[in-house]
Amino acid sequence: MSIPTLKQQANGTVLTLHDKPYIMLAGEVGNSNSSSVEYMEGVWQTAEQLGMNTLLLPITWDQVEPEEGQFDFSLLDGLVLQARGKGKHLVLLWFGSWKNAECMYAPAWVKTDLQRFRRGQIVKGKNKAPRENAYGMLYTTLSYLCEETCAADARAFGRLMRHLRTLDGEENTVLAVQVENESGLLGTARERSDEADVAFAADVPQDFAGYMRSHIETMVQDVQEAVENGATSGSWGEVFGSVAEEIFSAYYISRYVNRVAQAGKKEYPLLISVLLSVTEDITKSIIGIIAHADNTIITQWPIL
């Protein structure tokens, strides 16, 4: 039997499980519900009453790697076996570096080492800063430019997928895994650290600039106009004009997420997804207020 996959058929793309079409009648559980197998018993009762055959539920980095290099998959084991015992299926949501553009589910050893695992600054020089219309609450997130954080997240996700293959590679209780959740930052269109300023002033990678210019027809109007009117090479501002900061963030975030996803796929080539915040048009999203997992820049993902 093959693992769950997407197959092209005459009438569209079909999810298959054990080589047969599978329609997910699914619901997503609350963020904390899946932190307890015992609590999930009541959730499964509700799912059964609603006629669901699949649940989407979080598995978080701080749960599986509470100390660096020390992995605990007991909760994952319990959740998978529980679902299997009920004849149901799961889609796992990996809350790693980001959950809703914040780092609340990263392990304590990541969150407390600010030198090694840098924060994404929305105000230069400040690792925590208030956002507009956020009632004065301080905001903090991990930097999408930090190599150490990306590498640590990728290692953890790879170990998760390796364990999942051993646990579930034959039964396929888990149909797919989502990597991160609304990745990026809030409150500004790009990071404001000195490192981010240097990267933003540097030349856009030529393969990426060329890809964007060759896919103009897929873009919303504002992005299309910015690419058409921009330089063919040069800094992010020179190439992408008024949307440069948003595209800069999306470029580095998507590279980061893709690296994490690749680490998992190498261990277990299950279906992998990302979560995008849906907007109709870049002019209708408030740049820097929404998370950068935004469909206004989805054109970039195939090259990254």
Functional labels for PLM-detected ranges:
Residues M1-N53:
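N-terminal carbohydrate-binding accessory modules
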Residues T16-D19, E48-Q49, G85-K86, D168-E171, ...:
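Extracellular/periplasmic catalytic domains that process cell-envelope and extracellular macromolecules
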